[in-house]
Amino acid sequence: MRQVAIYGKGGIGKSTTTQNTVAALAESGKKVMVVGCDPKADSTRLLLHGLNQKTVLDTLRDEGDDIELESILKTGFGETRCVESGGPEPGVGCAGRGIITSINMLEQLGAYTDDLDYVFYDVLGDVVCGGFAMPIREGKAREIYIVASGELMALYAANNIAKGIKKYAETGGVRLGGIICNSRKADNEYALVKAVAEEIGTQMIHFVPRDNIVQRAEINKMTVIDFDPAANQANEYRKLAKAIDENQMFVVPKPMTQDRLEELMMKHGFLDAV
């Protein structure tokens, strides 16, 4: 069983990318569980065709500790197993703690069965705060992929996340598997993201082009694989899934300084030198 965490800045398309990749893996016959680690609880919506799944934390609040696995785990597209950890009430408590509680509960209830090929953790976070780092800190997720684009803040967040991974890689077995570029059609985006990936010692594992079919599929509460399996974009997600499935490059990242990141941006024509 490979345990994979997907990180990236808010709004970069982590949940969409994760669900489409998982759908492609499921289509190819892999058995996959997705654990949403975001208080928005939207990490499994497309796999479940819009079902507003009750989160682990809400279930615990309503029913106490004596809950059944069926109460928190739903089956989605391609027999994927879908869980949302949820979060505390706004302004109260730490969402990261919710992730810890949820994963512990899933372990207690026997969700991590031997027949699973993958568990994906879709994790909120521009910065790897202690709670949100839990899937890597506790050694649950062994491989990390960062979703980024060719925009400064996305790459700044990716570099920050690499710092967090480096910290935990030194004491545990977690490794960075690569950067997924979720294109925003920025100038020189492919070359820039590839250069940033290489600078921190990893690879751009796939460049996902921008395509409006992703939004059309989302409006219909589906992944692209489900909505239009013959679409070019569906094939892009299949390529990403295959790249992850066959990946052999797992590294301890070498994060950049802020100055070096800005140097790379300038080199690729993003920031005008003052």
UniProtKB/Swiss-Prot annotation:
It catalyses: N2 + 8 reduced [2Fe-2S]-[ferredoxin] + 16 ATP + 16 H2O = H2 + 8 oxidized [2Fe-2S]-[ferredoxin] + 2 NH4(+) + 16 ADP + 16 phosphate + 6 H(+). Binds 1 [4Fe-4S] cluster per dimer. The lineage of its organism: Archaea, Methanobacteriati, Methanobacteriota, Stenosarchaea group, Methanomicrobia. The reversible ADP-ribosylation of Arg-97 inactivates the nitrogenase reductase and regulates nitrogenase activity. [4Fe-4S] cluster binds at residues 94, 129. Keywords: 4Fe-4S, ADP-ribosylation, ATP-binding, Iron, Iron-sulfur, Metal-binding, Nitrogen fixation, Nucleotide-binding, Oxidoreductase. The keyword rRNA-binding does not apply. GO terms for molecular function: 4 iron, 4 sulfur cluster binding; ATP binding; metal ion binding; nitrogenase activity. Homodimer. SUPFAM superfamilies: P-loop containing nucleoside triphosphate hydrolases. GO terms for biological process: nitrogen fixation. Belongs to the NifH/BchL/ChlL family. It comes from Methanocella arvoryzae (strain DSM 22066 / NBRC 105507 / MRE50). This is Nitrogenase iron protein. Its EC number is 1.18.6.1. The key enzymatic reactions in nitrogen fixation are catalyzed by the nitrogenase complex, which has 2 components: the iron protein and the molybdenum-iron protein. ATP binds at residues 8-15. NCBIfam families: nifH. Its cofactor is [4Fe-4S] cluster. The modification ADP-ribosylarginine is found at residue 97. InterPro entries: NifH/chlL_CS, NifH/frxC, Nitrogenase_Fe_NifH, P-loop_NTPase. Gene3D superfamilies: P-loop containing nucleotide triphosphate hydrolases (3.40.50.300).
